[in-house]
Amino acid sequence: AQRPLAFDETGMEGRLGYEHYYHQNIADNPQVGTPKAKMKRLALELRKLAEEGSLPVSAESAIYVMRDEARVDVLKVLISGPADALRPEQGETPYGLGLFEFHVFVPQDYPNVSPLVNLQTTGDGLVRFNPNLYSDGKVCLSLLGTWHGEGWMPPTAGNSGSTILQVLVSIQSIIMVPKPYFNEPGYAEEEGTPAGEQRSREYNDNLRAATLRHAVRDMLRRPPAGFEAIVRSHFRLLRPLLERQLKRWVAEAQTNSTREGMLRTYAELRPLLDKLDAAAGSVVPARLPLA
């Protein structure tokens, strides 16, 4: 049901300029005079993204890309957190079924340099969702040159080079992992130890609560412009999975305060979900016995 919405375009320029994290970069780099190499490469990549099946869109995980209707180098992206209940063999993740918004700007030297990417889902700068996802939105990823490891590869005669899609998939698969605590440099050696695993559970506990607040409740309250239909459809279709996941998270909460916080968030979330069901003509489910 979500497939036709995977790639789309919308107007991102408002009366006061672009409503985008990289609005200054956009203003400083007008389309007039944009290098042909950048435009040619972007045209190729966006054409591929628009092809059915190019972007991963499933209940387990999804990536939705929105380009500006006037500028192909201005993008917004929603990445859904990998769903715990649907991929048990890969382990639990604390991001399950949440929607995380990223802003992307493609600089003039592209594809010789990587795109610029910033996370917008941060609870207004209060939440660091991962050692690689800062509360100011910085994304630490080797492809972006902001983390150790193999960096961005410009295209050559024998290699097509790195792509925007690779960046987005890497965020979902390399950063949004079951145990993000161990992404922190120096903490990896603790993995498998009783103390390290306990710290990881406590870390995930806080992230689960933050995911419910900001990537589910707040996303439903204020869906990003252009993504409204995707957000509504995502949470309406996946409500049963979301509520089963929430019940499990509440049962596994490491502290009473976290458990109570999740229950409060669900109390605020339920009317929003009921409203989606009512608008779609669905039967509103009975209250989930979380506690």
Residue ranges and their predicted role:
Residues 1-97, 109-291:
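UBC/E2-like fold recognition across ubiquitin and ubiquitin-like conjugation systems
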